[in-house]
Design a protein with these regions (language model features):
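Active-site acidic Asp-centered loop
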Residues: 116, 121-123
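Small-residue hinge/turn detector
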Residues: 106-116
């Protein structure tokens, strides 16, 4: 059933937006420069910084700490128009809640990265190493997939004894080839131009999403039909990224031994939507509790 749905969505989008695919099929990336070390890091929290949950604030602080030469640009509902313009039909559907904030943010990241370049990072990324994607025109987090009992498994390079189900199985459009929550590239890049155009076109024609991961489906469609887009994605090296492992161990008691295996990993994708315990059963801080009290791992 998953395979049929996956293929049906791609087939529908391909038929509906074949003109866009054709338009971009001859795009080249030869003129694209490498990611500018002074380009912005884009962070969005729609409700504003003051309304971030505490764990998100910790993640945001670590991003700023490791931003290096990249200026950090904070985007919220109150200021996004300063940086990005959208067609009236998009704004109207956002105001009517036809387009959710989550799906609007997908268009926002494509818009910002196309207009300015830089790095889009979800506000829930705990960052432990300096951010630098020099010497490449495009970057995203990707992992080698190891199939295990039908589930795609991502294993850390250099870290033994850790394995966790990768959140995209083999029928997902991303299949570990990219991560929408961390994308980086150059101003005017064809990949972001395409993403913006097809998402605008989709929401002009529709009042609901064909699937929650519509964003990944549009990237998959481009990957399959636009050679230069495929090249950009394929040229990104596999990252050290058991990116969800820390999240599922937040209630583990904090100790240097228990966190040592996470420290070599630059990015950990966390969530504010789950309830974690600040203290273990013996009263000692959990990893979650340590993060809140020390603002870092």
């Amino acid at each position: 059933m998953g395979v049929k749905k996956h293929l049906a969505i791609l087939s529908y989008l391909s038929d509906k937006y074949g003109d866009i695919l054709q338009k971009f099929s001859n795009k080249t990336t030869e003129s694209e420069s490498d990611i500018d070390p002074a380009s912005p890091i884009w962070i969005c929290w729609w409700q504003g910084e003051d309304n971030m949950p505490e764990l998100v604030k910790v993640c945001y602080e670590t991003i700023k700490k490791h931003a290096g030469s990249h200026p950090v640009k904070f985007i919220a509902e109150s200021n996004y128009r300063k940086y990005a313009a959208f067609p009236d039909y998009i704004i109207e559907k956002v105001q009517k809640k036809i387009i959710t904030v989550t799906h609007f943010s997908n268009m926002l990241r494509a818009n910002l990265l196309y207009e300015y370049g830089g790095i889009w990072m979800d506000a829930t990324i705990l960052t432990l190493k300096d951010i630098s994607f020099d010497n490449m025109p495009f970057f995203t987090l990707k992992a080698p997939a190891k199939k295990n009992n039908g589930v795609s498994m991502a294993r850390f390079a250099g870290i033994s004894g850790i394995a966790a189900p990768f959140r995209h199985d083999k029928n997902s459009p991303a299949v570990s080839r990219w991560s929408g929550f961390l994308l980086a590239g150059t101003k005017g890049s064809c990949i972001f131009e395409y993403m913006r155009e097809i998402l605008y076109a989709y929401w002009k024609d529709h009042k609901d999403q064909i699937d929650y991961v519509l964003y990944d489906y549009t990237i998959a469609l481009g990957y399959d039909n636009i050679p230069e887009m495929k090249k950009l994605i394929d040229n990104v090296p596999c990252s050290i990224m058991e990116k969800f492992v820390l999240e599922i161990n937040m209630d583990v008691e904090y100790s240097q031994e228990n966190i040592s295996k996470y420290l070599s990993v630059p990015f950990h994708k966390l969530t504010w939507k789950k309830s974690f315990n600040k203290f273990a059963k013996d009263g000692k801080l959990t990893i979650y509790g340590h993060l809140l009290e020390n603002r870092d791992l």
